[in-house]
Design a protein with these regions (language model features):
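DNA-dependent DNA polymerase catalytic subunits
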Residues: 2-33, 38-255
Length: 255
């Protein structure tokens, strides 16, 4: 198969490049199918590798990003990196998605702000404590149903009229059908709904009560949103909210 052959060639090139880096005393921190993370190489060393790859394999290597620091999780391919301008990269970010409830999105950006200011390993350790405390406090507020309903809302645009959904009915359409009891709902409308403990599992924000909120469902969404960041910091969501900790060690590399 072509895909397998292409993957094999890519893997071979990466492995050979790793060996070449070692031969000119560049420390390779991590490599996958299409990238390498190198610890503090000089411009001259980078150019040597670029020239070598072009001559040896006809491959153009580019310096993609320069990180102030990067943290690799014990989980395969999970990492967190902060570029020199303070921009935070975390593989598989979900906190930026437009339908993410405001309270989770707010926490997400607060965490990125903390990480972007880290300038040393000691500050990184302090940031872990801050991040852990923040998530723990948000979780407590969620369990106590102290977060305003509008902050819990999933905001989704409907692509067609609710009546056009027959077989599979998404959650935002279930909420839209409830809203139809009070007003007309049409294609293009934004439906704001919250997750509740009783059927049908969701309610429009304007029809919901705080005591109906399914805090467990929101906790699951919090965990899935922050899993990549936390695993890269050797923090465990379950531990932060009071459950047993999973073991793991992070690897910190400063440039």
């Amino acid at each position: 198969p072509v895909a397998e052959a292409t993957t094999a060639v890519g893997r071979f090139t990466i492995l050979e490049t790793i060996e070449k880096c070692k031969s000119i005393e560049i420390e390779v921190l991590y490599g996958d199918t299409d990238s390498l993370f190198l610890k503090g190489p000089t411009r001259e060393q980078i150019q040597k590798i670029v020239d070598w790859a072009k001559e040896e394999f006809g491959v153009d290597l580019d310096l993609d990003k320069e990180y102030r620091y990067v943290v690799f999780s014990t989980r395969k391919k999970n990492y967190l990196g902060v570029q020199k301008d303070g921009k935070v990269d975390v593989k598989g970010l979900t906190g930026k998605k437009s339908h993410t409830p405001p309270f989770i999105r707010k926490l997400f950006y607060e965490i990125l702000e903390i990480l972007s200011k880290v300038q040393s390993e000691n500050e990184f350790s302090q940031s872990k404590q801050k991040v852990g405390d923040m998530i723990s406090q948000y979780a407590k507020n969620l369990k106590a149903r102290q977060i305003p309903l509008n902050e819990l809302a999933f905001n989704v645009m409907i692509s067609k009229a609710p009546s056009e959904y027959v077989k599979t009915i998404p959650q935002h359409i279930r909420a839209a059908k409830l809203l139809e009891q009070t007003r007309e709902i049409k294609k293009g409308d934004i439906i704001s709904y919250v997750k509740i403990i009783n059927k049908p599992g969701v309610k429009p924000v304007e029809m919901a009560r705080p005591d109906e909120i399914d805090s467990a469902k929101y906790m699951e969404f919090m965990e899935s949103t922050f899993d990549q960041i936390l695993s890269s910091m050797d923090l465990d969501f379950s531990t932060l909210i009071g459950a047993p900790k999973q073991t793991g060690l992070d690897q910190f590399f400063w440039n």
